[in-house]
Amino acid sequence: MRLLPLLRTVLWAALLGSRLPGCSSLRHPIYWNSSNPRLLRGDAVVELGFNDYLDIFCPHYESPGPPEGPETFALYMVDWSGYEACTAEGANAFQRWNCSMPFAPFSPVRFSEKIQRYTPFPLGFEFLPGETYYYISVPTPESPGRCLRLQVSVCCKESGSSHESAHPVGSPGESGTSGWRGGHAPSPLCLLLLLLLPILRLLRVL
């Protein structure tokens, strides 16, 4: 049938020429420095969906930097007790990244965490739906920085579970931060493609 190649072309064009909102991942940048009051207070929370990315941007300065010196620190994943105490000494704490290049050329150092259930990489981290994960930073001895904290809530909890709304990190006018909430509804284009696939199979039979 002449309609079959045309329909196949339309489907591939839609898949390749579109980001398919609701079917693709989003990136969530967090500028990790002590000018962010929510990271300082420890009430910063972001909600992420699977296949989203958490992008951590380290402090970055033009030479010679601030008079008090540049912020440098190590970032850790910890449990709740480590998060409350802002310490990385617990048995479940481990270092995730190291922000040690405040004068990196061209742009700040960025570390990316992909929210995924399984990872093929030995240094990757595997997340569970409905769980909350805790990040803290510990300043190096020569750094003027302070302990910063972030909670990452992974969508979604099991049906019937209570869910407290999380506060996004950053808002208009808040210094150096931005954040979004996860849990993305499928886009109309994505749903349309899913509906057309059975029709395509039927046309191949005919």
Curated annotation (Swiss-Prot):
Sites of GPI-anchor amidated serine lipidation: S175
Q: Start and end of every Ephrin RBD domain?
A: 26-158
- GO CC terms in record: plasma membrane; side of membrane
Matching entries from Gene3D superfamilies are given as: Cupredoxins - blue copper proteins
Q: Does the keyword Transit peptide apply?
A: no
Q: What is its main location?
A: membrane
Secretion signal span: 1-25
Q: Which InterPro entries match?
A: Cupredoxin, Ephrin, Ephrin-A_Ecto, Ephrin_CS, Ephrin_RBD
CDD domains assigned: Ephrin-A_Ectodomain (cd10425)
* UniProt cross-references to Pfam families, sorted A to Z: Ephrin (PF00812)
Subcellular location per the Swiss-Prot or TrEMBL entry: Cell membrane
Q: How does it sit in the membrane?
A: Lipid-anchor; GPI-anchor
Could you list this entry's UniProt keywords, alphabetically sorted. Cell membrane, Disulfide bond, Glycoprotein, GPI-anchor, Lipoprotein, Membrane, Signal
- Identify the propeptide residues: 176-206
Which GO BP annotation is one of this protein's? Answer: ephrin receptor signaling pathway
Q: In which tissues is it expressed?
A: Expressed in myogenic progenitor cells.
Annotated GO molecular function terms are: ephrin receptor binding
**Positions annotated as glycosylated:** N33, N98
Origin superkingdom: Eukaryota
Purpose: Cell surface GPI-bound ligand for Eph receptors, a family of receptor tyrosine kinases which are crucial for migration, repulsion and adhesion during neuronal, vascular and epithelial development. Binds promiscuously Eph receptors residing on adjacent cells, leading to contact-dependent bidirectional signaling into neighboring cells. May play a role in the interaction between activated B-lymphocytes and dendritic cells in tonsils.
The entry's family comment says: Belongs to the ephrin family.
Stated name of the protein: Ephrin-A4
Question: Which species does the entry assign this protein to?
Answer: Mus musculus (Mouse)
